[in-house]
Amino acid sequence: MLPEWPAGTVAVLSTAGPHAIPVSTATRAGDRAIHFALAHTRDSLARLREEPRCALTILAAGVAVTAYGTADVVDADDRVAYLRLDVESVEDHDQPTFSLDEGVRWHWTDERAEAGDAEVRAALQRL
């Protein structure tokens, strides 16, 4: 089962290749699904269309998991494709010897990019 994590948490999407990129739109969509968005220009999107198996590693305060499964495009607009990762298994990296105090701290430096991100997140919530 997937844990909860804060909006904007930076996660790492790993696709065939191997190839990995940070994503900040990963949204929990139930116990076994994650929604996220990728720009149409992302190599990762092309890779997922070719080979949908992937892993998403989520690191936030109190959360250290990798979700394994297959991702498919479920919707798109002119800027991004909206994907659903159907989670087959979750590896919990939690250990009794350490604790994650926080995830990656980041912020937008461009107001238009920040507004666009808010629109993408709202669309992900509607999926």
Regions found by a protein language model. Name each.
Residues 75-127:
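C-terminal edge-of-domain segments
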Residues 2-39, 66-67:
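Short beta-strand segments
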Residues 31-33, 49, 69, 105:
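Alpha-helix boundary/interfacial micro-motifs
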Residues 12-16, 39-48, 124-127:
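Short low-complexity stretches enriched in small and charged residues
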Residues 41-98:
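Short, structured beta-strand-loop surface elements
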Residues 6, 52, 73, 124-127:
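Generic secondary-structure transition motif, activating predominantly at the C-termini of alpha-helices
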